[in-house]
Amino acid sequence: MHKSKEDVAKLFADKLGTDPHLTPEQLTLVARDVLREKYVQAEVGITGANFIIADTGAVAVTENEGNGRLSAAWPKTHIVVTGIEKVIPSMTDLALFWPLLATYGTGQKITSYNTIIAGPRQENEKDGPDEMYVILLDNGRTNILANEKTRESLYCIRCGACLNACPVYKNIGGHTYSTTYSGPIGAVITPHLRQLGEWKHLSHASSLCGNCTEVCAVKINLHELLLENRYEAVTEGYAPFAEKVAWKIWKMAMLRRSWMNAANGNMKGKVVNGMGKAWTEHRSKLIFPQKSFNQQWKEKYGNR
């Protein structure tokens, strides 16, 4: 989405001295050779976890590339960094969650590499790390848990289905969100993981079409949670003064037909295209009809 295969080939040429015209398949082989040596030499490997299994204390990692397995097996020390919401009750629950994650994430029945890691290398074992550490992150997750209305967002299994379905994400990409979690789920949880006043704008980066809710693997009501974030931002006093004034004027106008009819096309154009210059910086100017729908209706049909 952000880089073409030509961009990647040029990057490899600049950093690794390879041919700038390599195909994607050839680039993959180059990356494999370079990275494999890095894994062999590494002292510490850091991975995440798709799930943490409560009854055994094991970590479950699912992937298609095999990088996670290499990070856990080759280095002497393996560090797992994962959120507290990744805990599932038992090993048997993987029979549901692994296929669910694969199907909604990539359309597969199951991903290529599925690994359960229960600790460092034991006596008489030939591979694995000497030490293993699991770091459980809160980082605002208990804030979400304490909020009854947004709590369901912690159900997320990070399949990415909502990102693939979101028209906003498909047009602007993930880097635009400037945060760890992008797309609809990122817009829902980031204001609570960080600071609502600073990140409330993410909840407005949505058409509220509901595609995200429709495709969610665990049935999180995402578009309603985006509205909840907007509501909380306003009730907690994070709405700008100019926005409050604008909505009050809008409300007064909507309750008075004479005001609405008085605002002809020229006036609307001057207000929107003149005062809202940021809107037209990257868009065409909005063109409004000279008469309102109400005026046109009366001219054509009278008062019926």
Where are these regions (language model features)?
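Exposed alpha-helical structural elements
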Residues: 7, 11, 26, 30, ...
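Short linear elements at protein peripheries
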Residues: 267-304
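Short, contiguous, pocket-lining structural segments
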Residues: 86, 154-158
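Ferredoxin-type iron-sulfur electron-transfer modules in oxidoreductases and energy-metabolism complexes
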Residues: 124-153, 168-274
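Extended amphipathic alpha-helical segments enriched in small hydrophobics
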Residues: 159-163, 209
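The feature marks the mature, well-folded catalytic cores of soluble enzymes
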Residues: 1-149
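Short alpha-helical basic/polar micro-motif
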Residues: 55, 164, 214
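Small/polar loops that bind or transfer phosphate-bearing groups
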Residues: 82, 158, 217-218
